[in-house]
């Protein structure tokens, strides 16, 4: 049995002058049936609420202010789920709406609850349709794009594959719209991904979406580090999903690492919000990165922010480059007290245990 997550972007769902959003969903849904009939499981992460809301309200360009974005998302989400329900019901498929914000994944308990709910739904042969809850999320609590959200959903359910449907055929060495010599990249191994991502070789943001290729590369990095294969495919070609379901290599394939970091450390790395920052000396940075050590108070040079036990912090080196994230074993007040030599014989106290520390 396979469990796949498919992320459907706004650029796909908006359709064209010849194809409506409903027709796009119909084309997609028909390709799902043979995959599901073999006992496989599917979760969709969908964008499109803001775009549909703007269509409904006759707003010609994507709003810039948060309140209008949230209002159009509220209107559009109703239309979006209505279309999914109408189309999938014709095929005898049941769906469920799941709306998520960053806060829902911020604690380990809520992350696990979301995971259990999603897994139970697919056990019941229901297709969960996930979207960010744009109506209530403020800027601080927004993922801002569903590419990142789709990777976290894939990790939460231990998916075998994440498929990113977009409006380009595959990843390119340069932006193909502006560079005739751009070369397609068919395969990306994890050792290559960070360099490609950091170069930000394309930035194909469109008017209606919030992602672009850069967020898809971030999504691929998150998922592959957690052991999930990622495939980036042109979703405007309705034959492509059939090709994917037949295990054909089209688009760009991102291979997972051989030794995934595990569900818990994936959550620490990518889902949790940090509330403080700890700067390490060079010795502590080396011990954490190369020896898998816990962070001890003796290796701490500076503390920023206020935090209590079990809250998440960003851990950086002397150049302010992120080394890791982790859950602290002591409060910021206690740690500052140690650094200020107000307490003696506490330099060996554990600040972040290696079991709750994830390398960046």
Swiss-Prot record:
The keyword Nucleus does not apply. GO terms for biological process: L-proline biosynthetic process. It is found in: Cytoplasm. Its main location: cytoplasm. The keyword Transferase applies. It comes from the Bacteria. GO terms for molecular function: ATP binding; glutamate 5-kinase activity; RNA binding. Catalyzes the transfer of a phosphate group to glutamate to form L-glutamate 5-phosphate. This is Glutamate 5-kinase. The gene is proB.
